[in-house]
Swiss-Prot record:
Keywords: ATP-binding, Carbohydrate metabolism, Kinase, Nucleotide-binding, Transferase
Catalytic activity of the protein: 1,6-anhydro-N-acetyl-beta-muramate + ATP + H2O = N-acetyl-D-muramate 6-phosphate + ADP + H(+)
NCBIfam families membership: PRK09585.1-1, PRK09585.1-3, PRK09585.3-2
Pathway: Amino-sugar metabolism; 1,6-anhydro-N-acetylmuramate degradation; Cell wall biogenesis; peptidoglycan recycling
Signal peptide range in chain numbering: none
Family: Belongs to the anhydro-N-acetylmuramic acid kinase family.
Domain of life (superkingdom): Bacteria
A Pfam family assignment: AnmK
Name of the top EC class for this enzyme: transferase
Annotated PANTHER family: ANHYDRO-N-ACETYLMURAMIC ACID KINASE
Organism of derivation: Salmonella typhimurium (strain LT2 / SGSC1412 / ATCC 700720)
Protein name, UniProt field: Anhydro-N-acetylmuramic acid kinase
Amino acid sequence: MKSGRFIGVMSGTSLDGVDVVLAAIDETMVAQQASLTWPIPVHLKKGILDICQGQPLTLSQLGQLDTQLGRLFAQAVNALLAQQRLQPRDIVAIGCHGQTVWHEPTGEAPHTLQIGDNNHIVAHTGITVVGDFRRRDIALGGQGAPLVPAFHHALLGHPTEKRMVLNIGGIANLSLLFPGQAVRGYDTGPGNMLMDAWIWRQCAQPYDKDAAWAKEGQVILPLLQKMLRDPYFAASAPKSTGREYFNYGWLERHLAAFPGADARDVQATLAELTAVSIAQQVLLNGGCERLMVCGGGGRNPLVMARLAALLPGIEVSTTDKAGISGDDMEALAFAWLAWRTLAGLPGNLPSVTGATEASVLGAIYPANPITQS
């Protein structure tokens, strides 16, 4: 069974950077050793957003973006290697999620698309890459997401305490870790995505630092109620979503009925949408003793305060309190999934995704043995 140092690479729906994590992994432990966040250039971020909003592009443009992202991921990995004074031969493999640009797991031809050419990562790092984790699950009738609940269970499951792990990235997803029960999990709806999109359009800021702007506004209750009537929130699990659904166009359609709304009030309402839509799902599943939050949303004091207020009797805290960096959780999960793949172990949970069976996930892009020698 493969064990040793692995690198996880994650570029999520928030587009706030490429998270790269170094970890020692074997069948008994996942020990994070180092991490960094690598910036995404503005032109690449724009290209990704255009695709996710359904903007037309040529196959040449898609191919270029695929290559450019692969090179960017390689740069991020090489920066971490240099920081830690490591050589390619010191790393067993890279687990790379890629950048999701479309996710449509239902219909006659369900599909998901992550770009960032893994061949370029191998060529520019000299390290074996495991990628393309989601499509096997979709081929088996699953949603292809979320994949992190299996990792949450491995690291944070408890024999007696009823726990939930909440990842607030661009999209928020919930893992239900209940003793004696199969792990469940699904996307609850927008996390940071709509808040980030609104402040970017209004203030040219990538995100609302410390929720300072939202705190200046007041929740527009009719707007909140209108958004919460979206059918996604009432849909049964398993379910997953992404930027192709909850995007700026979705927000504009809801705002059309509220001309002249104060921009700060809209930001406050979007923060409340994130908190309320999550809290509703926590309560729908019977609540828990501890809600452990990871992802960028764990650093949003307004969302965290609202979750605590909406969920009395539940301890709401970040995973940092349990010794696992909330910022690095997803990248760490894909390092772990790479280890699972190389060990021939399944990476999905049918109880989460709805797949017909558990399966080894991903494709392996082997490094040139000469490069790794």
